[in-house]
């Protein structure tokens, strides 16, 4: 049997999907070439199995003749017959199973795997638990459909239109929960199971992944290796171990939405997105809700006006809100849960049927063996990554909630794509987090992007602001819901928009306009001069831009 060797060529000049075909044909015309594998035109590489006596200059010359440039990157001897496979490159000469192994099968993991496949690389993806990750299974999808169900039932008994008489009727929680579960199943199937089937070059592996001391990944009894790794294992609800927590058996966001029977009363620990969304949802479904927040205001990372405003609106619906609460311990007396706390220097007790802990999330990194890979972690267990999504180990990238990047599914997915490209294509593409819009799906909604007034001042800008109450927005007047406001933050020197902060019904539908304005450096007078359709909520952005210079109360409809 003639001796063989494996060559890896660095190819330059490929610009489209047809280029690898041209190069493969050119290389196979050289005597002694047995197999050619080019992952994709963006990979800039070709792997060959050739006879050992082949002249390497003949290979590079053949590539040059096809209009490209090639250099030999590595050469290694092979003993015996090697069968190359598009699904696995684990070979007797010490090759790897995959070019990229993605750990995690949620939105971030899928984005990384799809990008790597699009680039032409061999991809493995390890999933543990329900495919689809947090968003579709226990996060965005189930919570938002419950929010809409609760809103519909609430509005049936509380809408502001005279003469349009409606009644709430009875609430069938079993049916509400079943419809929620059906939607989760449908979206998991259509957006993950079916999508995976459409990418046959992604090898799906089920099980918990753990790095070993030799740098490989163990899943059950199997060992896998890869050139590069992307960790996208997400996060889970943070459950603080207060004294008495074991007996109190507090709920988290997942277990709350799975309850077979709604409690009569609920204490919510927390005052940010999940706490407010689920707290209001439960209240609108007939549960007596009390929100206890450690900070002195709700949503403390937002503009103070938003925290004050949403507190007032929640209280108007009968939801109790107490801020400045220091929880000391939990206890239980039969079916009653008790929160023992200090409020303004006084010891107090709060009682309810159930307690919901909505106190943030913790990264899923425990038990992964990352200590074997010298991967640096934050104190909360999150993987430290740079703007290219690369960890302290140059072969390992991470994205999504397992990092300390903003916990939004769209940030996770964007990071997955960036991580895969940088890991495999020798690029340095940063994940742009300069303009990340966020929406809290309370009613009214909280929608923000860019800098708050305080943040802008801290960064050294000469700041100017404008605020328009929803009573000046025609859409809100027609809908008879003028709760809230729109606040814009701008640089007085350049007139560029720096931040937008909305508290309004369906405010999330208006925030993307502000996002684009900030991203592309649009000035507030450009916003003011732009045509906005009348009787839309987003027209409020135009009015807020005009309000920097004029009193909009003195303008007619659509006037500028």
What are the roles of these predicted feature ranges?
Residues 91-108, 262-272:
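Beta1/beta-strand and adjacent pyrophosphate-binding region of the FAD-binding site
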Residues 246-263, 349-425, 509, 513, ...:
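FAD-site-proximal beta/loop scaffold in flavoenzymes
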